[in-house]
UniProtKB/Swiss-Prot annotation:
Pfam families: DUF1507 (PF07408)
Cross-referenced InterPro entries: UPF0358 (IPR009983), UPF0358_sf (IPR036270)
Gene3D superfamilies: SO2669-like
NCBIfam families, A to Z: PRK13666.1
Stretches that traverse the bilayer: none
Source lineage: Bacteria, Bacillati, Bacillota, Bacilli, Bacillales
Family, per entry: Belongs to the UPF0358 family.
Protein name, as recorded: UPF0358 protein BALH_3577
Biological source species: Bacillus thuringiensis (strain Al Hakam)
Source organism, top-level taxon: Bacteria
């Protein structure tokens, strides 16, 4: 029974983290669709805050043993790649 509970908590933790990552990804996608200026202080503040918050959530879940460190790194890495693509797309638009 205890291992079933742990497994359930692990699944819930991963689902919650993925939901938070999806929210950030949607924000990035909206910016990509409109190619609004990523250097906008408000935009940067929101994304930085969201990314920092998610990184803390991931760290907490890893430390509790709810997700593997590799899962957390992969989740954050995907978002960082999307952010890089947004910045690159905006830079290309400016040229």
């Amino acid at each position: 029974m205890a291992s079933e509970t742990v497994s359930n908590h692990q699944e819930k933790a991963l689902a919650l983290l993925q939901a938070d990552a999806e929210k950030i990804l949607r924000l990035i996608k909206v910016q990509m669709d409109h190619l609004t200026m990523p250097q906008c202080p408000l935009y940067e503040e929101v994304l930085d805050t969201q990314m920092f918050g998610l990184s803390r959530e991931v760290d907490f879940a890893v430390r509790l043993g709810l997700i593997a460190e590799e899962q957390g790194k992969a989740m954050l890495g995907e978002l960082e790649r999307e952010l890089s693509a947004l910045h690159e797309a905006f830079t290309n638009k400016q040229q």
